[in-house]
A protein has these predicted regions:
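Extreme N-terminal starter segment of soluble prokaryotic enzymes
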Residues: 1-4
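Di-metal (Zn2+ and/or Mg2+/Mn2+) metal-binding site signature of metallo-dependent hydrolases
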Residues: 10, 28-41, 152, 156
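Conserved catalytic scaffold of divalent metal-dependent phosphoesterases
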Residues: 10-14, 32-36, 45-49, 56-135, ...
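Short amphipathic alpha-helical segment that frequently serves as the phosphate-/nucleotide-binding helix
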Residues: 19, 40-44, 168
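A short, aliphatic-rich alpha-helical micro-motif
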Residues: 19-20, 107
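Conserved acidic residues
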Residues: 23, 30, 53, 111, ...
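N-terminal Rossmann-like NAD(P) cofactor-binding module of classical short-chain dehydrogenase/reductase
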Residues: 26, 114, 149
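Binuclear metal-dependent phosphoesterase catalytic core
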Residues: 86-90, 138-143, 147, 154-188
Length: 188
C-alpha cells in the first residue's frame, strides 16, 4: 500500500497539480487558513476530486469550523473524516486524532496514526522551541503504530524513526504559509 502525506496546505491545495500515484492520500490538517466554512468546502471539493481510492483527513489548528464536528455528512465513498475515529483499508488500521484532543482516544492496534500536532521533541522545533505534545509522545510510543503522520510545525519538516515507529512531519508550507515542499510517499 502506498500512502501519500499532505499537511499544512493553508488554502493552497489547488497548487498541488502533479501528485504521485498512491492508494491512500492523507491530509494532516491546516487545509484552510482562517477555518471558514467556505474554505472547508473548497478543500473538500478538491480533495474529493483527487484520483485516489481512499482519502483521509484530520483537522488542524487553522480548521476552526470543524474543531467540534463529530462527522461530515455525505462524503463520497472512500473519503473519511478521521475526527477521533479510525477506518480499516485492506487490513491496515488508520486512526485520526483531532487537533488538541486527548491522546487517550488513540486505541491500541493502530498501524497508521494521523494527527496535526507532533509529539514533543520529534520534528517539532521552531525558533529554538519544541512545540510538540508530551502526552501524545507517550501514547504513540505505547501504541507503536508503524507510521505517525502529522504536520503543524512548518520548519520541522522531515522524517525520523524511533522505537520502530516512523515519524513524519509533512508540513508543505513555510513560515509564511507558502507551499515550498513536495508531498511525501510511504510504502506500507
Amino acid at each position: 500500500m502506498r500512502i501519500l502525506q499532505l499537511s499544512d496546505t493553508h488554502n493552497q491545495h489547488t497548487r498541488l497539480t502533479e501528485l504521485p500515484e498512491a492508494d491512500v492520500v492523507v491530509h494532516c490538517g491546516d487545509f484552510t487558513e482562517n477555518g471558514t466554512e467556505e474554505e472547508v468546502l473548497d478543500f473538500l471539493n478538491w480533495f474529493a476530486g483527487l484520483p485516489y481510492p481512499h482519502k483521509l483527513f484530520v483537522t488542524g489548528n487553522h480548521d476552526l469550523c470543524l474543531w467540534d464536528a463529530e462527522g461530515i455528512e455525505d462524503l463520497p465513498d472512500g473519503m473519511h473524516f478521521l475526527q477521533d475515529r479510525g477506518c480499516v483499508i485492506d487490513g491496515v488500521r488508520f486512526f485520526g486524532l483531532a487537533y488538541n484532543h486527548p491522546e487517550s482516544l488513540i486505541p491500541d492496534g493502530v498501524d497508521v496514526l494521523l494527527t496535526h500536532e507532533p509529539p514533543v521533541m520529534l520534528l517539532d522545533k521552531s525558533a529554538g522551541t519544541h512545540w510538540g505534545n508530551a502526552p501524545l509522545r507517550r501514547r504513540v510510543l505505547e501504541v507503536k503504530p508503524r507510521y505517525h503522520l502529522f504536520g503543524h510545525v512548518h520548519e520541522a519538516w522531515g522524517v525520523m524513526k524511533m522505537e520502530d515507529v516512523v515519524f513524519s512531519n509533512g508540513a508543505l508550507a513555510d513560515n509564511c504559509n507558502r507551499l515550498c515542499r513536495q508531498p511525501r510517499l510511504f510504502a506500507l
